[in-house]
A protein has these predicted regions:
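Short, solvent-exposed turn/loop segments enriched in Gly/Ser/Thr/Pro and often Arg
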Residues: 171-173, 184, 239-246, 715-716
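Carboxylate/His-rich catalytic cores and anion/metal-binding grooves
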Residues: 145-148, 163-185
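Cleavable N-terminal signal peptides
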Residues: 12-13, 23, 211
Length: 891
């Protein structure tokens, strides 16, 4: 039997009262420490409150230990509570070591594994608060901990404490918990009580902290993954909100499709966990659980899903949410029409009938969801542990018989630091990486010493395969028609070598002993030593290397001079037009920078033709209706040494932008988000609106006076009517039965490689297309096409693209003259989620001030004539009127 029949309707409600009944005063109740019970109407505990309560528990019980596991983005300690019996906690290090051995399976046979299983405990990860506005998650962790620590003579909890070691995260996002709670407290009792937060609840990426599961760009995701690798939990359970209305909780099984790189043991037990949870909730009189509807887990980068590629049972649930801690009453006539009859379905067995929904209800559902997982783990401890071992054992065996037998990343590439970064990402995900000695060969190719090899006969190598291979999303067209069905929840292709511009070779023959003898395991990637050769007036560094931009910005900050070579010059990557030329600082200073950024330099004579670069004044639009794309852009620019200044609505609406900025970047957002933002009455007055017509007028003035305006993806499309540009978005108004691409990697061809905008970009880069535009020029266009999709060729490299003929031969990126200035439109995200490193240069190349060459002569009209023509037109409203929050999907 997988679940327990309770004697009371809600375990959490009963146990919160047990202290007063049984006199367990030594274990403090939440109310005794916080002055409130988690789940109380109109009350939310912030991170300080939460940690204070957990420390009070740890001071009064030998069943809990607190550990600091890292720092948040804003520098707060991230803490976890480890809960089990006192006897188990006394042997915690031993159990962690055993869990790791079973998870990796490398030094065990079946009998040894079975022997370890008999004496081992099953480690479970449960958390709350990854998405901070899904507030019940953080509140439920306190209740769950209290229940586990205060139970007396409870067979279910006694079994859990004896068999399970719970790694309980009070929150995965301390900074975000504080932001949301303090915002709610500030507005409590006003008409803005349930207002949305007007900024990202993670400093840079907000909701996308659950899209960073393999790239590990953010500190919080680095900490979570490091801790997962330390504890090797068999189950990784992440609590989210909100469920598809009117369901009260969404639980596994997931919708299809699912990756074939996931172990069958994991796939089947994901279903078991979900069906058991459904039965457990029913037994506890908790109606409204639904499965399959809406959520698939095709994308590998969900933080709460990436662990499946390490053979963990990793999943999430979505509990119903109104807004913060404010209750709401629902009647059945508010339900979608098909749900108003309250009819039971196969995956919605006990429909919710409506009524009041309090934060306490959400907390109770989460507590019982967590208890169902702990109860299941306690009753199936040996099976779960042995399955974890078998999954690793079988993965190792599979890749000893089937290709790819290894992946090789040469350390001699157009952008070697990017190659090293890709190898380091594998290490950070728990994958063993080896450096080669001289003479290593594979597939008949000799690789330089220091190249990196990932043998696939290791326990977590499914992660490498998932990230390196091209994704092929299952057919999403209805048989015999062009109609799209079963459309994906998130992006469908993410192949990292393509995104990062790194050559990775799959080894098609088994590794033999002589090859393995030439490999040395590395824990941290060491890049080849940067070199300085030659003598000359300036030092040339390659424009093909992303890290060169870090070096350039550091040199400018030190008072150096930087220019772009307009004639071919020698660099460490070969002869190159567009190379950076560094001068004005000492040889020692340049040498120090080359070592810091692993970028080699060559001393050369100053070429006859150069373009002098200057540090630009960069403005990055930061709307109050938050843009995740803005946050990613800000993070990337800061990491590369640029100094963007946030531009808010009031800044854009003010005149004389050119007196303060040289370049303005508009991140991806909906047209309504750009123009209108939050409506009146939704948020306090200072956060209302978007750039508005005044802002567009001032952006026109800014560019006309010589400024550079850069726009990504949907915003690029919005600017066409707003600024009367002689460009058309060929996908405007096109329905999914004629074209669909929610996120895939597409090949483009570079036009005008001689232009500074394309310096360092490969001839045929791969871009992340995510529901963006594709362009064609109209009469009067004066400018240049920077990249276009191939003609009569499907540009798809990885993921799902329906009806590629709609964009074949169309423009992906362009630059056009506007008065004295320029506008750059990118119909994709060149900085997608901090992953698409190969296209960063499309953005970076535009972030310096210099005297740019004139645009190509094929244009018919002069910039002045075109500007006058554009100014004579009224700025049209954008055709699309999306919701400003349409990026904020729940999972």
């Amino acid at each position: 039997m997988l679940f327990s029949k309770p004697v009371q309707s809600s375990l959490s409600a009963c146990l919160l009262a047990v202290a007063s009944i049984t006199g367990l005063a030594q274990i403090p109740t939440p109310a005794s420490v916080l002055g409130h019970t988690p789940g109380d109407d109109f009350y939310l505990a912030d991170y300080g409150d939460t940690i204070r309560y957990f420390h009070a528990l740890a001071a009064s019980s030998d069943r809990i230990k607190m550990f600091t596991v890292g720092k948040s983005t804003r520098g707060q300690d991230i803490e976890v509570a480890v809960i089990s019996s006192a006897a188990n906690l006394a042997k915690l290090d031993e159990y962690k070591k055993t869990a790791g051995r079973l998870a990796r399976a490398e030094d065990l046979n079946d009998e040894q594994a079975k022997e370890l299983v008999r004496s081992s405990k099953v480690i479970i990860h449960i958390d709350g608060g990854l998405h901070s506005d899904e507030v019940a998650g953080t509140q439920h962790t306190m209740t769950l901990a209290y229940n586990l620590l205060t139970a007396k003579n409870d067979p279910e909890i006694d079994s859990i404490l004896d068999n399970v070691i719970l790694v309980l995260w009070p929150t995965l996002n301390p900074d975000g918990q504080d932001m949301v709670v303090h915002w709610y407290r500030q507005n409590l009792g006003t008409k803005y009580e349930v207002s949305p937060l007007p900024y990202l609840y993670q400093e840079y990426v907000g909701h996308d902290n659950n899209r960073d599961g393999y790239m590990l760009n953010m500190k919080e995701e680095q900490v979570v993954t490091k801790t997962e690798l330390e504890y090797s939990p068999v189950i990784f359970y992440c609590q989210h909100q909100t469920a598809p209305f009117p369901a009260r909780i969404w639980i596994p099984p997931f919708s299809d499709p699912i990756s074939s790189n996931i172990s069958p043991y994991v796939r089947s037990w994901l279903n078991v966990v979900g069906t058991n949870m459904s039965a457990y909730l029913d037994a506890h009189n908790m109606p409204g659980a639904i499965s399959e509807s809406r959520f698939d887990n095709w994308y590998a980068g969900f933080t709460d899903w990436a662990g499946v590629f390490r053979n963990g049972i990793s999943f999430f649930t979505e509990t119903a949410l109104y807004r913060y801690a404010t209750p709401r009453f629902y009647t059945a006539d508010e339900f979608p029409h098909n749900d108003q009859d309250l009819r039971a379905l196969t995956m919605y067995t006990t429909p919710w009938e409506g009524g009041w929904w309090h934060l306490k209800d959400a907390v109770d559902y989460m507590v019982d969801g967590s208890m169902s997982v702990l109860d299941l783990a306690a009753k199936n401890r040996e099976t779960l542990l042995y399955n974890r071992y078998q999954a690793a054992r079988d993965n190792i065996a599979h890749f000893r018989k089937e290709p790819p037998f290894a992946y090789v990343i040469s350390d001699k590439q157009a952008d070697t630091p990017e190659a090293g970064l890709l190898a380091q990402k594998m290490i950070d995900n728990g994958i063993d990486v080896y450096a080669t000695k001289a003479g290593f060969q594979a597939n008949g190719v000799s690789y330089p010493a220091g190249s990196w090899v990932i043998p696939m006969d290791q326990p977590y190598s499914a992660m490498a395969k998932e990230l390196f291979e091209r994704q092929r999303y299952p057919d999403a067209l209805e048989n015999g028609t062009s109609k799209a069905i079963d459309l994906p929840y998130d992006v469908t292709g993410w192949t990292l070598p393509l995104q990062m511009g790194v050559d990775v070779d799959a080894v098609t023959d088994p590794l033999i002993a002589d090859q393995r003898a030439m490999l040395t395991k590395v824990d941290t990637i060491k890049l080849p030593d940067a070199t300085m050769e030659g003598a000359g007036a300036v030092f040339a560094i390659s424009h093909k290397v992303n890290a060169s931009f870090q070096l350039v910005n550091a040199a400018l900050a030190q008072g150096g001079t930087v220019s772009l070579a307009q004639d071919p010059v020698k660099t460490a990557q070969g002869s190159e037009t567009g190379a950076f030329l560094i001068g004005g600082i000492t040889h020692a200073a340049v040498d120090s920078l080359t070592k810091k950024y692993s970028v080699s330099a060559v001393g050369v004579a100053a070429p006859a033709h150069t373009l002098a670069l200057k540090k630009a004044r960069i403005g990055l639009y930061r709307p109050w209706a938050p843009s995740i794309d803005e946050g990613w852009t800000r993070w990337i620019l800061e990491n590369y040494g640029f100094e963007p200044k946030s531009l808010y609505n009031a800044d854009i609406r003010s005149a004389n932008l050119k007196s303060r900025y040289d370049i303005i970047v508009l991140p991806d957002m909906s047209s309504r988000g750009l123009m209108s933002g939050f409506g009146v009455g939704i948020v306090p007055g200072q956060y209302v609106g978007g750039v508005g017509e005044d802002g567009i007028d001032h952006l026109r003035e800014f560019v006309r006076d010589g400024g550079t305006l850069i726009a990504f993806n949907r915003t690029a499309s919005s600017l066409i009517p707003l600024m009367s540009l002689p460009v058309a978005n060929v996908l405007q108004g096109v329905k999914s039965d004629k074209f669909f691409c929610s996120g895939a990697l597409l090949r483009v061809e570079t036009d005008h490689a001689e232009m500074p905008a394309n310096y360092g970009v490969s001839e045929s880069p791969v871009v992340m297309f995510q529901a963006g535009p594709a362009f064609e020029t109209l009469p009067g266009f004066h400018g240049a096409v920077l990249a276009r999709y191939p003609k009569q060729t499907n540009p798809l490299e990885s993921g799902l693209l329906l009806h590629p003929e709609a964009i074949e031969g169309k423009i992906a990126a362009l630059e056009l003259a506007y008065g004295k200035g320029r506008i750059l439109l990118y119909g994709f995200k060149p900085q997608f989620r901090g992953q698409s490193h190969a296209t960063y240069k499309y953005l970076f190349n535009e972030l310096y001030s210099f005297d740019r060459p004139p645009l190509p002569a094929e244009a018919a009209a002069s910039g002045k004539e075109k500007a006058e023509a554009m100014e004579s037109k009224a700025a049209a409203k954008p055709a699309a009127q999306e919701d400003p929050d349409d990026d904020d999907i729940e999972e």
